[in-house]
Amino acid sequence: MRARWLMMAAALGVAACSGEGGDPDAGAPAQDTGVLADSGVDSGVDAGSPADAGSPDSGDVDDAGPSDTGVDAGLPPLGPVTIDLTSNRPPDLLSTMNLFRIVDGRFEYNDRVVPYDLSTPLFSDYASKARALYVPEGASIQYTESGALDLPVGSVLIKTFLFGEDLRLPQEELHPVETRLLVRYADEWRAFPYVWNKGGTDAVYFVRGEVRTLAFIDPRGVSRTAQYLIPQKNQCLECHERKDADDRRFTTPIGPQARQLNWDVDFGAGPENQLQHLADAGMLSGLPPLGQVPTAFPWASLATTGTTALAYEAVTEAARDYLDMNCAHCHRPDATQGMTSRLWLNYDNTDTFHLGYCKEPGSAGSASAGRQYDIVPGDAEASILVYRTETEVVGDMMPLLGRSVADDVAVGIVRGWVDGLPPESCGN
């Protein structure tokens, strides 16, 4: 068996939400104010070792790359991956599918389960994420230049969310909180959410969702308290649902785009391009020369460059890619919020009005905090988009789901982009 290992601080996986039309078991998320990384769910499995953290220097712990140590812990091999596409309900225990296990603070992935990292990741209250994808034997991903890569039936996208009490420490223990699976059925993508037990040894299928109060020190040394949302299954549609040209609804992954994977990470034998790695493994077809593949802004580079030293061109790229990954799943022409608000934040939108320049909001209401336009070029303070990106006021903050505290690094980037735009006098 080829085992793949990953430090817990690595950012691996993709958004995991469902194309199903609702789950009768999923109600409003419950409130849980228990201790950090206590799932409130116990599978009865004996507790094992917690996870180790990596370096969070960039201001967002979701930024490290995968690695493959080749370590053999002396455990029996994982059994074959088991994905039952005939059932609408997954196994009660995540371990039943044999996608991965956590040993001595590391992820061990099964054959044809490959960790990956996003160039510009989604921010989720500073949670670290372990991302991976599974492709069945004999099948391969089809390259697409824009949007998510086309994964074959039977594929699984895996994203595990992890937290620690002090995110400044390179070896701070991280604890798995939840794992979201996105499974490719013949007719749609379906989501299966799991919550980890107290010992971090297994995760239980859990569709109702809950809110946890988590106290931690962020990578900049700021003490924070997040109202961390483990979403219920039905909430997935709020981010992942789109409409096609015939107005039919469908669900799509968000993260694993070619432009987000076109950069080097360490799989254990030195830096490798992630797309090339998949192609060399026979798991990706149609890959053009890498020089022809678009590339998203390398968010991890901010750990060394910081934000103040960036040229304005780089600030613009970083801001547009951040908005694309964190906002454009809703704010785009083929998503419900984009259709309603007419604010399109996808990175390839070149229409400045629909990007928000001097555009009055369609439905912001009191969330505009007295501001009149989505973006006032040259004036971040007067721009609704900047306010909603940085505020922590419930009902005003954006995105609506997935964060309760501000991403200070991203706020600085977005502010710098708007302030640097050629000034316009909106309304005149």
Where are these regions (language model features)?
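Residue-level detector of buried hydrophobic side-chain packing
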Residues: C17-S18, C239, L323, L385, ...
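Ser/Thr-rich, Pro/Gly/Ala-heavy low-complexity intrinsically disordered linkers and tails
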Residues: V14-L78
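Sec-dependent bacterial lipoprotein signal peptides
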Residues: M1-A15
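Long, charged, low-complexity terminal extensions
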Residues: I83-T86, A319-R320, D324
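Electron-transfer interface patches adjacent to heme c in soluble/periplasmic c-type cytochromes
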Residues: W263-R320, A328-A335, S341-N428
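N-terminal pre-domain segments of enzymes
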Residues: A64, T69-L133
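Extended surface/linker regions that mediate inter-domain or inter-protein docking
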Residues: L122-S124, S128-G138, Y143-D321
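Cys/His-rich metal-chelating microdomains
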Residues: E20, R242, P333
